[in-house]
Amino acid sequence: MIDDYEIALATPEDIPGIITLQDPNVIDRGGGLSVRQTADWFKRSMLEMPIVVGRRDGKVVGYVLSTSLAAKAHVAIVQAMLRTFPAPPDCYLYGPVCVAETERGRGLAQIMFEALRTRLPGRPAMTFIRADNAPSLQAHRKMGCKSSECL
């Protein structure tokens, strides 16, 4: 199944597909994503840090973000996380990860995560996952991520 995916750095041409995938997965629509990002945000973000996409038959079916701590320093949950867990040097924020419902359970999140780590070798990453986001918690456990504490 992993061979069914093209894993690549996102390009501006991927943004409409990323938005299409993001929108039904935001919290106010019953999904696990806490924040809805705009097309302009994705365009600016991909110039600063890698965004990895998974495509099947040319269609974006997953993505994972990386963001500098400075770019998210104004976000309350990030501020709380950094007060509780001071960031190590050269740390970046990882996530969110979004995978199309039809693709979940096939290892796509893990291969995108590994592709991102390859792009940022040796750099530590931090993320936060809402306690009620069971699918994300389970996926991250499978990927070997460790949980620290609840904020």
Each language-model region and where it sits:
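Hydrophobic adenine-recognition pocket in adenosine-nucleotide-binding enzymes
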Residues: 10, 94-99, 129
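Conserved acyl-donor/pantetheine-binding loop and adjacent beta-alpha core of acyl/acetyltransferases
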Residues: 65-96
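Conserved active-site alpha-helix within GNAT-family acetyltransferase domains
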Residues: 110, 131-150
